[in-house]
């Protein structure tokens, strides 16, 4: 994706620069979804092995939930890092080429919306 960047290391999942970014929140909906996906994976595992779906292997279901949340946490950290790099490059380009991005004139809501005439 970003192979042309200087200093790019090909087989590194999360570079050291990602440590400066704030960590994802633990109640992020995407992490909750990953935990739910892990729980459903545990249920599917029980179903495929013909065990009682909800009651058998609760420790395995907990293991699936924690491992999916753990993997999702680092996936979110990587996604946030890639978005930060993209934003940094984009804003750097905007700073270097201001003639391509002229300032728009500010309009008030009165100029945008139609006048309001109440009907009685």
From Swiss-Prot:
Locations listed in the record: Mitochondrion inner membrane
Keywords: Electron transport, Membrane, Mitochondrion, Mitochondrion inner membrane, Respiratory chain, Transmembrane, Transmembrane helix, Transport
Membrane topology: Single-pass membrane protein
TM regions (residue ranges): 57-76
Keyword GTP-binding: no
Signal peptide: none
One GO cellular component term: mitochondrial inner membrane
Pfam families: NDUF_C2 (PF06374)
Keyword Transport: yes
Domain of life assignment: Eukaryota
Any one biological process term the GO annotation gives: aerobic respiration
Subunit structure, interactors included: Complex I is composed of 45 different subunits. Interacts with TMEM242.
Similarity comment: Belongs to the complex I NDUFC2 subunit family.
Function: Accessory subunit of the mitochondrial membrane respiratory chain NADH dehydrogenase (Complex I), that is believed not to be involved in catalysis but required for the complex assembly. Complex I functions in the transfer of electrons from NADH to the respiratory chain. The immediate electron acceptor for the enzyme is believed to be ubiquinone.
Entry protein name: NADH dehydrogenase [ubiquinone] 1 subunit C2
Phylogenetic lineage: Eukaryota, Metazoa, Chordata, Craniata, Vertebrata
């Amino acid at each position: 994706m970003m192979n042309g960047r200087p200093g790019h290391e090909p087989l590194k999942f999360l570079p050291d620069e990602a440590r400066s970014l704030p960590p994802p929140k633990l109640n992020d909906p995407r992490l909750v979804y990953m935990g739910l996906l892990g729980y459903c994976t545990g249920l599917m595992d029980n179903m495929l092995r013909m065990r009682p779906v909800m009651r058998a292997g609760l420790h395995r279901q907990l293991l699936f939930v924690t491992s999916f949340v753990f993997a999702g946490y680092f996936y979110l950290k990587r996604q946030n890092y890639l978005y930060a790099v993209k934003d940094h490059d984009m804003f750097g380009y905007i700073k270097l080429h201001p003639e391509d991005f002229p300032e728009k004139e500010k309009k008030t809501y009165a100029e945008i919306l139609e006048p309001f005439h109440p009907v009685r």
